[in-house]
């Protein structure tokens, strides 16, 4: 390569140019030369800042998002550009662009002085076109300012204005560019920067757009076409002006024949070839909207990166490789199950589900889907609302009993504790309303079916009597239950402004909203829900009480191949491992026996241990199911997403006048249908070991026996054990004589220090209990038999079973 021009000559030429430009600029624009010094200082600052950006900045490039198997999810970009190194650009392309745009590229030092001075002199004589003599360096400067630096329309106009001032800035930056980089580096930067029309920026994307090949494979005629288009991408578009594009291509080939005599024969042959472009531009889909059933996950990835300090704008320009945690082998059955029970064409009803892999170091999001299509056509049922990971719907219903239970275990109760299950529960100070006939300023709760008068925590979670958990939250305290929900994973509830749907004038968080009013109904899950966070609650319990943010990122690689740290919140041991593991066991009967999800589990052929909980809101406008094993955690949430929510019905899922959708219907069916195909994909499935501390309760959790004592003695014994004693006794059916102390409510184990009510006999013997259910949760034992005779067969004896009690809804 020829030596650079001597510095002295360069300076003299620049000085002469500057002198001419100063005279012209002063004569035409600044009649009072006193302001010239200030203008010059500001111009110097502009040049210095522009040069720094030019040398250190990066051009916008496409970021590619892929799943865990390397399949592309989406391309995210503001300019469709893929940077490639010099050795990935064909020499044909390098020779073509130099030949047509700057044949003295190898000889000058960034500026073609003859052409530049001619252009400036022409400006002085009235020719406002100062483009004469622009080198590749100068073109690079102008294109960089236009395509990268300029953010506003005014800045873009300034980047291409035909004035000596811009030309002088361009010259100074071009000289700096030439001093900093080699010619090969400048040429590579140029070819990676410029526009080639049809939204193709840089030679790699241009080669793909017009020919469907890589830049390294461009032949003579292809390279010549692209090089010719740089002059005017709109007028030389081969799809709208093929004749003009062909003529310009051949002009480029003619210059190459002149400048490259050794390749003349091949270049003449290239002139005889047709344009050879694809029938249509090979454009790249842009953004999450083109990601199909992975679009909501794609949106969540961007939201997660934004929380980590990497904005959507940075992603759209940064040229990142975003390796995500999405597992296509999990995503496919999840989407299929969702669509099976909630058609994508179902108006006004959404079904969302996410699957998370538990862990103590990370909670990786394996799948995320909705029955809704991600898009802008509202009439077609499309939406761009982040439904799977935002607060939506009317709530998850009885699933929230998990939080009340966890708070009680944290206070010292064990899962062997017997919970009272009265037919009706009423209390003041816990909100108001609820069941029919509720007194003023009183919260009233009834059950949806008939239940035994008491049951242990495991059975209560499986069969879901409302009154048991209404009474339990009155003992635990609303604040503790809310705090537990947030700790385990419902983190959105702590965000300011989340209560606006319930109090538009307030900036309160949902947590503060519920606590301020001390709403006992929180245990019945009546407030909107983030379904991804509910899945993460399950992941926290499956991870031995370790909460981690639901993480969609496996690895983030920058354009230089370096890994970028992505940090949002850190993992935290939010409840003791013993509590989480024991609660997982307490939730293990929901899918068996009389559990509210047993029918769905059986229909899916589910035969593995798991923990789960169904939930339904009182008005049947939303319902859900959360379930987990030691290998995966997931929640399905179905809700009315119309502007005027109404009751939902089951089988098939639809709007109706009087709702009958329960968590044990479509939500749990969706969960088991989705998880059954991949149930054994991640290793052995088993329940964790329990912790005696949370099975039998902490010291002070056992209620002493007071049967046979007088009332005063019973009160004293309970107080000595650390319990509070209710002022009023409770009259119960008993074979003991009238007025005798026969027990307490609760009895056995409960929360240490909680309120205990003394039970007094009313002298009326209790009714005999119904036949007990077998241990395996099967049908009740036979109460008789019947002989059936069928001709040709011996007599058949059929056992007669007592009708089982109806399975209560969650």
Regions found by a protein language model. Name each.
Residues 677-810:
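Ligand-recognition elements built from short beta-strands and adjacent flexible loops
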Residues 1-64:
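N-terminal type II signal-anchor transmembrane helix
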Residues 106-116, 203, 263-265, 409-432, ...:
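Short, well-structured active-site flanking segments
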Residues 139-150, 192-199, 216, 220-232, ...:
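Glycine-rich, acidic and aromatic/proline-enriched surface loops and short helix-turn segments
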Residues 263-323, 349:
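Non-catalytic structural connector segments
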